[in-house]
């Protein structure tokens, strides 16, 4: 009986506590990671109106995306921001640094998936819904009835990014006015 109890306890530690500890450690790594020298400069070349504070805000949005991927159990996520996707693309070009980042942050390589909006394609919707959920939770926003957008979903609109994705937390008023082009945060909570 003592052996069985010890083995059960060991299984709990190895199966529950260690993975949670590792996830928390990886999340802290993502939050505090120092970007490679010159990365934000490269983003600013693509977006000449950006000041360093703007690039830093975009980098916070990219961190939010990486955290959503990690906290979802490394399940498929879609990038909801064009400007954060631009920074992700630049980061990938620092191949050694990106590979090392992925190994420490996720335990393996995170392949790039293009920025997308809510669509007819179920897999893309699942990825957007997942990143919406975790970004909302990260910022203490109710994902079903949001009163504001999480940073990652607000970036393109904030910076008026060409071909960017514009989201609204709640589109009831927009729909009443006949605007069907808006992407609505509350729609991400819909399971359909």
Give residue ranges: language-model regions.
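Acidic, Ser/Thr/Pro-rich intrinsically disordered cytosolic tails and loops
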Residues: 1-192
């Amino acid at each position: 009986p003592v052996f069985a109890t010890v083995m059960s306890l060991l299984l709990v530690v190895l199966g529950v506590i260690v993975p949670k500890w590792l996830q928390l450690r990886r999340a802290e790594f993502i939050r505090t990671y120092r970007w490679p020298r010159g990365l934000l400069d490269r983003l600013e070349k693509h977006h000449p109106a950006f000041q360093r504070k703007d690039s830093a805000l975009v980098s916070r949005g990219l961190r939010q995306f990486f955290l959503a991927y990690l906290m979802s159990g490394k399940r498929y996520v879609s990038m909801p921001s064009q400007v954060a996707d631009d920074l992700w693309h630049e980061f990938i070009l620092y191949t050694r640094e990106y590979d090392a980042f992925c190994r420490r942050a996720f335990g393996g390589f995170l392949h790039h998936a293009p920025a997308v909006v809510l669509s007819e394609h179920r897999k893309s919707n699942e990825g957007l819904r997942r990143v919406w959920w975790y970004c909302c939770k990260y910022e203490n926003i109710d994902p079903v009835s949001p009163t504001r957008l999480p940073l990652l979903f607000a970036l393109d609109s904030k910076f008026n990014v060409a071909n960017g994705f514009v989201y609204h937390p709640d589109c009831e008023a927009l729909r009443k006015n006949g605007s069907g082009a808006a992407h609505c945060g509350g729609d991400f909570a819909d399971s359909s």
